Design a protein with these regions (language model features):
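Short, flexible helix-loop junctions that flank or precede catalytic/ligand sites
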Residues: 1-161
């Protein structure tokens, strides 16, 4: 019974694995306008965004003997979490759709998976291309943007058979 989830779960955690750039051969380059736009869009909703300067650089995979000419060596997780507090518990019981739960959790100030990934891109851990391969960066955190996305007055329970 999905209504018991809210009272029995403490934390919801999502993860994706990105390949880690090889420290021996990764190559830096200044941000392009397109890269800066993608990063700025994602960071716009970040609760404590890293500073993006004119001198900020990104790194790309190159390939060498250490990484078997792939440009990557190892994997690391990008994460997002939702603490199940009273607001999230109520959302899970009322309407357990992802966008409703994330909207209820927004006040927690926990970075989204895209935001965590961008932090790893800016630190040189992985490349923007690699992050885009595993995480949808087109919208940052899923948020309600129109009335059509909001739950109806009847809520989810009225549609359960």
């Amino acid at each position: 019974d999905y209504r018991m989830i809210g009272s029995s779960v403490n934390l919801i955690l999502g993860q994706r694995l990105v390949r880690v750039l090889c420290t021996h051969c990764k190559q830096s380059h200044p941000l392009t306008d397109a890269e800066r736009k993608i990063i700025s869009t994602v960071l716009a909703t970040h609760p404590a965004p890293p500073v993006l300067t004119k001198e900020s650089v990104l790194y790309d995979a190159a390939g060498c003997d250490h990484c078997n000419h792939t440009g990557f060596k190892g994997r690391q997780g990008v994460f997002e979490a939702v603490r199940v507090d009273a607001a999230v518990e109520e959302a899970v019981i009322r309407d357990p759709r992802e966008n409703i739960i994330l909207e209820a959790a927004k006040a927690q100030g926990i970075p989204s998976m895209a935001e965590d990934g961008i932090e790893k891109v800016l630190s040189g851990t992985t490349s923007l291309t690699e992050l885009q391969r595993v995480v949808d960066l087109s919208s940052g955190r899923h948020t309600l943007t129109t009335e059509d996305d909001a739950a109806s007055a009847d809520d989810f329970l009225s549609h359960v058979v």
